[in-house]
Amino acid sequence: MKKSNTDTCCLTLPLKLEKWQEDRLAKRFEIARQIYNTMVHAELKKLRNIEISQPYRQIQKQIEALNWKNQNDKARLKSLYNDRNKLLNTIGFSEYGFKADIKYYYKHFNDNIGSSVAVHGIAPQVWAAFEKMLFHKEGKKVHYKKKDDIHSLRGYSVTGKSG
């Protein structure tokens, strides 16, 4: 983002809540954490099932045998990564697959967590964690959220109305 030429100031005000509002927010954050952890658990199971399959193991073995720095291996690695991605996509291991899967987990909490929050807020967070682990060097494994780890939720609405 481009730096602004005008002088700017940021004002941070504390959010003063009544006890019942605080309790309602805490309940929704806890429910979001439970949905997140349930989704992580289910997707880890799905990933473990594909990891023990023969085609996936063969692809991984070939990927590990090649060197990314070697110019001759780069094209082969690219095709192997594409094959692995196709294999993962067949079981619904994509952002849209996660958004489709979350409908099974938030229904029980439908009074507190709406579909827009679950589909556009929680599922992309779970996908981002798996994406780091699978496709980037940043992540080694996906962690569950501890109690009081979630401090905000977001949803999405086409009409612009929230809640």
PLM feature spans:
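Nucleic-acid substrate recognition interfaces
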Residues: 1-163
